[in-house]
UniProtKB/Swiss-Prot annotation:
Its EC number is 2.7.4.9. This is Thymidylate kinase. It catalyses: dTMP + ATP = dTDP + ADP. The lineage of its organism: Bacteria, Pseudomonadati, Pseudomonadota, Betaproteobacteria, Nitrosomonadales. ATP binds at G11, I12, D13, G14, A15, G16, K17, S18.
Amino acid sequence: MQRGKFITVEGIDGAGKSTHLAWLERFLQDKGLEVVVTREPGGTALGEALRQLLLDHRQAMHPETEALLMFAARREHLDKVILPALDRGAWVVSDRFTDASFAYQGGGRGVAQSKLDNLEQWVQAELSPDLTVYFDVPVIVGRERLQSTRVADRFEMESNLFFERVRQAYLQRAEQFPQRIRVVDGSRLLAEVKTAVAEIVEDFWSDLSDTQFRG
């Protein structure tokens, strides 16, 4: 059986990434694929428990503790959800993955990239998403969207400066991995953003089909 593909969706809080997950799931299902939609932190019983701890605004923690908890949740996520799904041929779509750790704990909190690199290698070995769609919005746009949706969690309560560091870290990742990370202007009209996402996913699908045909 052919191994499934791994797609991740990234962006600062309020970028609108979650809005497009349902569309992406339907697109892949229409191709006749089994699709597993999940999220980080979370995706497993332990991961969801860690998520509650990480998002609780009453719970202060050292930046490196935060990074370690994120990767602990990720290890469980890989073992219980992501790898089994990929091995049986399913496609996995995750709301955030390791790029978020480099952006939030690295860029936002200042955890050294070398430490995150080591954690990534230890937890994931050679596993990396096949495609990442990053929704980029100015910090002020993301903040305005959040203010009208829900009570802020521990990350959402951070300053604009924090989110600017996170955003810049994401953009640096996109420059570092241009073949994998595709940037979408999330500040555009919803219909325009959907069109951009559709083009990216269609191109990815076409490239896969061409490769399989040649093989």
